[in-house]
Amino acid sequence: MTLTAIFRGEHLEPPPWLYARLAQGSLMRLIYRRLLADLAGSLPPGTRVLDVGAGPGYLLSYLARDRPDLSLWGLDLSHDMIRRARPRQRAMAPETAPRWLVADACRLPFPAGIFGRVVASFSFHIWPCPVAGLQELQRVLAPGGRAWVYELRREASLPDLKAFARDLGLPLPFVYLGSQVVRRHHALAASEFTSLIRQAAGARGTLQPAHHIFWRAELQPA
């Protein structure tokens, strides 16, 4: 499958109500816990964090609970997704609750250099502007900041799937069948992801496997 086909795959994404339901499920909660451990353990106190493509907002809600010292911002292009995220904000103390807004990853509504960490989890493959989007993540990074972009690895092997299932305490058949369903249209190959990173960030972007079956791209400030 070509890059053009991948980045025109929005019709393959679940509607917001179904995505929100899936995000509440046990599998996504386990995955969010892994990403949360990556984030929470790496951020200095008071870091300003932006979640791009935040969906219904579970990752930032979990992060707000574990790290109330952080300043959290979440955005999504879907009004419905942000509508679903905001009720969790009302249940938190105002000083710790994430701030939610509807916005486009291709044109982030922030000045340059203000976020210590930017994260995008499993939304990048449907961005219509992959290179410009990565450059926008770089643009808003503060000096010393990092952007992390998580996606599913198309090359994930059976041993990778076994390790992932073992770590999360899930049945291998469940993980295997699920991966086969989503990997064709929702996963990136190393060559594809690396090419986009090089176009956007040059030597200031790297790609490495994460949690057995995912990629994590890391971008430094431009």
Positions of PLM-derived features:
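C-terminal alpha-helical "lid/dimerization" subdomain adjacent to the S-adenosyl-L-methionine
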Residues: Y150-W215
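Short glycine-centered segments of the SAM/dcSAM-binding site in methyltransferase folds
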Residues: R48, G145-R146
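C-terminal lobe and adjacent flexible extensions of AdoMet/dcAdoMet transferase-like proteins
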Residues: R216-A222
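Class I SAM-dependent methyltransferase SAM/SAH-binding core
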Residues: L50, P56-R107
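A short acidic, Gly/Pro-enriched loop at the edge of an enzyme's catalytic core
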Residues: C106-R117
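Conserved class I S-adenosyl-L-methionine
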Residues: M1-L43, Y58-Y62
